[in-house]
């Protein structure tokens, strides 16, 4: 395949709504990025990250000296957890405001970078808080400059305008999407991802798979989102087993990261629908659930529900997983079964019962899918009408 002709050590610029430096060693581009900020009169930043990955990955070994060499003032918020809450965002924003930060650097996967995006908004809207942002009490039109240093190959948040946070007292996990949330620059360096363990590697990659499953089949899907989806699935099927078997395999990490970026661009254009709308209540109620594994638990049932309406599209997109499909509605159950078999084969084996849910929880999950701010927008993009009965059946078939 053509991938063998590409030098993964050659950093290239992936230009979409932002500029992403992509390739092994691209973390060194942070110095160039900081110089751009400095030329704009910005010399004070807040770094938003998790509790240890920014150090374990090796990113901090490059970022910290670059900040100090260029004379930047910086503050650090390193308490972002999986499925971050609005309270974490407010804590970080408070530090940023108090220290006079004029830009935000997010280091991590989707949780830290989404938190960084949200903090960037609140640095500009000092009279607002994260609950107001995620309950859509105001529509932000500006944010402080955002730099995203990505440490996982799954969310695509470094190339898109989305962010997610949980409002814990309501079990809401809404998403927001505004143009001001695009990072100014992003870094996608696969050498920072070799410390991802097997579970993390699987979870983040299944997130990317779901992004394109949805982006290719929404009511606003386009040839562009379908094209990105086809290549994403091909790369995931080829390189996920290699990364699971050998975490240090930089070629596998490179192409999974590229697949993740493509998936981010795909759903930035084609949007999302059922799997994300139905997973968000799961990880809102049980924050310990890895987002990608929650998606994997319900994906086969979603495929079964939507395939008759989008058979020709999914037959092509899923051909690396289920070869030989004819794109006929009658294939729905077969495709769902084969998708689940593939998920189990790569190590994504958990179903809703494994997360501690029972079928008595289904009415609550349906209610959250229907009432959480923003999820109605996702449901309205589904290729089938997302009635309560349809949603309940998907949950029912995911145990």
Curated annotation (Swiss-Prot):
Gene Ontology molecular function terms on file: alcohol dehydrogenase (NAD+) activity; alcohol dehydrogenase (NADP+) activity; metal ion binding
Induction details: Seems to be constitutively expressed.
Catalytic activity: a primary alcohol + NADP(+) = an aldehyde + NADPH + H(+)
Keywords annotated in UniProt: NADP, Oxidoreductase, Zinc
Entry cofactors: Zn(2+)
Comment on activity versus temperature: Thermostable. Heating at 70 degrees Celsius for 180 minutes gives no observable loss of enzymatic activity.
Top-level EC class: oxidoreductase
EC number(s) per entry: 1.1.1.2
Xref: InterPro entries: ADH_Fe/GldA (IPR001670), ADH_Fe_C (IPR056798), AdhA-like (IPR045910), Alcohol_dehydrogenase_Fe (IPR039697)
Highest rank taxon of the organism: Bacteria
Pfam family for this entry, one: ADH_Fe_C
Subunit text: Homotetramer.
Homology family: Belongs to the iron-containing alcohol dehydrogenase family.
Function: Alcohol dehydrogenase active against primary long-chain alcohols. Pentan-1-ol is the optimum substrate in vitro, but also shows efficient dehydrogenase activity on propanol, hexanol, and ethanol.
Name assigned to this protein: Long-chain primary alcohol dehydrogenase AdhA
Organism in which the protein naturally occurs: Thermoanaerobacter ethanolicus (Clostridium thermohydrosulfuricum)
Name of the gene encoding the protein in the UniProt record: adhA
């Amino acid at each position: 395949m053509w991938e063998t002709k590409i030098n993964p050590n050659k950093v290239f610029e992936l230009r979409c709504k932002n500029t992403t430096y992509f390739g092994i060693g691209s973390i060194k581009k942070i110095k160039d990025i900081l110089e751009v900020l400095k030329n704009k009169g910005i010399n004070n930043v807040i770094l938003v990250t998790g509790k240890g990955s920014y150090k374990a990955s090796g990113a901090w070994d490059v970022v910290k000296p670059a900040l100090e060499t260029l004379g930047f003032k910086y503050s650090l918020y390193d308490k972002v957890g999986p499925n971050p809450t609005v309270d974490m965002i407010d804590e970080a924003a408070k530090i940023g405001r108090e220290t006079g930060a004029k830009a935000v650097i997010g280091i991590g996967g989707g949780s830290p970078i989404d938190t960084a995006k949200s903090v960037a908004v609140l640095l500009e809207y000092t009279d607002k808080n994260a609950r107001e942002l995620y309950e859509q009490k105001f529509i932000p039109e500006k944010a402080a400059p955002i730099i995203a240093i990505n440490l996982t190959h799954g969310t695509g948040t470094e190339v898109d305008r989305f962010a997610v946070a949980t409002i814990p007292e309501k079990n809401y996990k809404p998403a927001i999407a505004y143009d001001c949330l695009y990072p100014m620059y992003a870094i996608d360096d696969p050498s920072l991802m070799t410390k991802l363990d097997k579970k993390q590697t699987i979870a983040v990659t299944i997130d990317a798979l779901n992004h394109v499953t949805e982006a290719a089949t929404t009511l606003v899907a386009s040839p562009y989102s379908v094209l990105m989806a086809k290549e994403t699935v091909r790369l995931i099927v080829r390189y996920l087993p290699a990364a699971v078997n050998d975490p240090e395999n930089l070629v596998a990490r490179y192409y999974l990261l590229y697949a993740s970026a493509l998936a981010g661009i795909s759903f930035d254009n084609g949007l999302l629908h059922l799997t994300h709308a139905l997973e968000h209540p799961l990880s809102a109620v049980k924050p310990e659930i890895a987002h990608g594994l929650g998606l994997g638990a319900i994906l086969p049932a979603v495929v079964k529900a939507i395939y008759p309406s989008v058979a020709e599209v999914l037959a092509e997109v899923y051909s690396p997983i289920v070869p030989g499909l004819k794109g006929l509605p009658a294939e729905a159950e077969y495709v769902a079964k084969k998708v689940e078999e593939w998920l189990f084969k790569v190590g994504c084996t958990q179903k809703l019962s494994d997360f501690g849910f029972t079928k008595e929880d289904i009415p609550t999950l349906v209610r959250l899918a229907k009432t959480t701010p923003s999820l109605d927008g996702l449901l309205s993009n589904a290729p089938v009408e997302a009635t309560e009965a349809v949603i309940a059946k998907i949950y029912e078939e995911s145990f």
